[in-house]
Amino acid sequence: LGRPAEGMEVEASGNIIKNVKSVFVPGTGGLRGIPAAAAAGMAAGDPSLDLEVLSQIGEAEQARIREYLAHTPITVKLADSPLIFDILVRAWAGEDSALVRIANYHTHIVRIEKNGAVLKDLPVQAAAEEGLTDKSVLSVRGILEFAREADLSDVEETLSRQIRFNTAIAQEGLRGDYGANIGQVLLSAYGDDVKIRAKAMAAAGSDARMNGCGLPVVIVSGSGNQGLTASLPVIEYAKELGADQDTLYRALLVSDLITIHLKAEIGRLSAYCGAVSAGCGSGAGIAYLYGKDKPEEALLKDVSHTIVNSLAVVSGMVCDGAKASCAAKIASAVD
């Protein structure tokens, strides 16, 4: 558009509306929902930062966002689309107009228009869950073999960032006042045992993320909450067991890949709570920590039983959108 929009219309698929309607928008000082997200992006976003588009917002920008939101009409509609992930934004200012459509996954811009002229037009995948990579090669046996044999130099940078970033936001969740403070409540009520710390750290990270904290998170399966749940319990158990860094990396490979393996058939957005998949993944990673020196078949049996047991208990949990209560669901999934 080239200038601030005088009005905006957002069309989104049902799962997008569900997931955004109640969650705080990072950096906005407590605003929530799709209109707030649209206003934040238009008034103060930095598109060069991709998924961290709102990461540089300060107090001055917060005031500008609130002013913009108060005086700019922003409407939200349910998209008439068969896709699970579909967002179309129209914006206008004076005689100028612009349209951008994102489909299938979070960074996939498929259409851009300016004043009716089409600047970008990509085909939309009819099967919205195809994604960028073929995950059909994944299996529990294959994941364990890879975790044991992988050259860690190929994954060390990503896993070290996962440890550093996700631990930082969990610690912030334990320090600050975010949502229902599930992580803090768990530690204060039940003590500092590793079983409590494992779920408290994951819950605290979600406390912060779901309630406006702008710290970055290394995601898994397109989800920050899943990234937190798949990693932080494993990190806590690795500390408790005195595992070295290489062992922690390999356990995180198990957790992350089991989570992705489970989510591959569920889809990026669904009515199935993704914390369940990630909690199951972290359980598999913890089982790896305890059984890493066992023979291959014995380790496979331990991890497989962990997956079956965890899914048998909590797989009925429903996703009703991202919000403060996600932290409690994460604690239940890890438990």
Where are each of the predicted segments found?
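Early transmembrane hairpin of solute transport permeases
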Residues: L1-D80, I87, A91
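Acidic-glycine-rich active-site phosphate/pyrophosphate-binding loop
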Residues: P4-I16, D193-G212, D244-K263, I307, ...
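Glycine/charged-rich beta-loop-alpha catalytic/anionic-binding loops adjacent to active sites
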Residues: I16-F24, A208-I219, T259-L269, C319-D320
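Signature of multi-pass transmembrane helix bundles
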Residues: L69-G212
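Conserved phosphate/anionic-ligand binding catalytic regions in large, soluble enzymes, centered on
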Residues: L1, L215-L232, C273-S277
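Alpha-helical support elements that line or immediately flank enzyme active sites
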Residues: L1-R3, M42, G227-Q245, A284-D293
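A structural signal for small-residue-enriched, beta-sheet-centric alpha/beta enzyme cores
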Residues: E11-N19, V23-P26, V100-K114, L119, ...
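Flexible, glycine/charged-enriched surface loops at secondary-structure junctions
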Residues: A5-G7, L49-L54, T75-L78, S153-L159, ...
